[in-house]
């Protein structure tokens, strides 16, 4: 749990007195629609970014210099992917219509921008994940008759999965936070509850947006933790030793 999440979580009970359930009941359909929009805009870019990043990360991890270090091209790739994440989200959201030719309020701007952020995070996580698998294991698998594809699919990916899934957790929670910024340019999400609540001085609207954003982050993070345990059962066995 991040420091910001901890602060917000501890503040929610203090602000509960400002929450009016009548407002929640009257606006239930709108809240559900914004929640689904938020979930879609957060999850789809993670899937797209990860799918694009993993082949790049694997290639970068396997490209080693003769002494075991990284080649200049690989270092440049990692630097550029890290640099992408330093671009402020609101600036990238505003830049997207110029690049894509879309409307400023199109959800596609948020989807593409967050796919870029997810890609940059997952390239770094993927390289670290594949680097964590010793080359000797891959070479042993090849010596036993595994094809390169079988060695990657049955050895490299399962052993790299814990680090990859940790990267997915970071990317997912980060996207849930950044989707809200899209409300500033008119893209509907739970962030719309923040902007509308502030503009119309409706504390209930703000509190619902905060609570649902936090809840979504906790639920998705928990699901990814569960997925990690399911896909890597040997780690639980190692911890019990």
Task: Mark where each language-model region is.
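Glycine-rich helix-loop "coupling/hinge" segments at transmembrane-helix boundaries
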Residues: 98-99, 178-212, 232, 236-241
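Faces of alpha-helical transmembrane segments in polytopic inner-membrane proteins
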Residues: 52, 56, 81-89, 109-127, ...
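Loop-to-helix entry region at the N-terminal start of transmembrane alpha-helices
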Residues: 33-41, 93-121, 161, 205, ...
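Short cytoplasmic-facing helical segments at TM-TM junctions of multi-pass membrane proteins
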Residues: 125-164, 190, 194
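Transmembrane alpha-helices
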Residues: 43, 148-181, 208
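C-terminal transmembrane helix and the adjacent membrane-cytosol boundary/short C-terminal tail
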Residues: 63-64, 127, 131, 143, ...
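Periplasmic/extracellular loop-to-transmembrane helix junction in inner-membrane transport proteins
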Residues: 3-45
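Cytoplasmic-entry segments and transmembrane alpha-helices of multi-pass inner-membrane transporters
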Residues: 56-96, 124-128
């Amino acid at each position: 749990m991040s420091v910001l999440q901890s602060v917000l979580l501890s503040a929610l009970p203090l602000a509960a007195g400002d929450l009016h359930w009548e407002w929640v009941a009257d606006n239930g359909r709108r809240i559900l629609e914004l929640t689904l929009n938020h979930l879609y805009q957060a999850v789809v870019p993670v899937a797209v970014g990860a799918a694009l990043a993993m082949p790049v990360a694997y290639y970068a991890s396997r490209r080693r210099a003769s002494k075991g270090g990284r080649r200049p091209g690989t270092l440049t790739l990692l630097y550029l992917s890290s640099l992408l994440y330093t671009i402020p989200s609101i600036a990238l959201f505003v830049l997207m219509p110029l690049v894509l030719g879309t409307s400023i309020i199109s959800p596609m701007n948020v989807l593409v921008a967050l796919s870029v952020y997810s890609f940059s995070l997952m390239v770094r996580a993927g390289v670290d994940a594949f680097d964590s698998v010793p080359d000797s294991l891959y070479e042993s698998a090849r010596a036993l008759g595994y094809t390169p594809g079988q060695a990657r699919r049955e050895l490299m990916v399962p052993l790299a999965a814990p680090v990859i899934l940790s990267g997915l957790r970071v990317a997912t929670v980060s996207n849930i936070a950044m989707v809200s910024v899209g409300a500033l340019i008119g893209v509907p999400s739970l962030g719309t509850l923040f902007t509308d609540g502030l503009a119309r001085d409706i504390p209930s609207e703000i509190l619902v947006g905060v609570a649902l954003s936090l809840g979504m982050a906790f639920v998705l993070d928990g699901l990814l933790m569960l997925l990690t345990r399911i896909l890597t059962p040997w780690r639980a066995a190692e911890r019990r030793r």
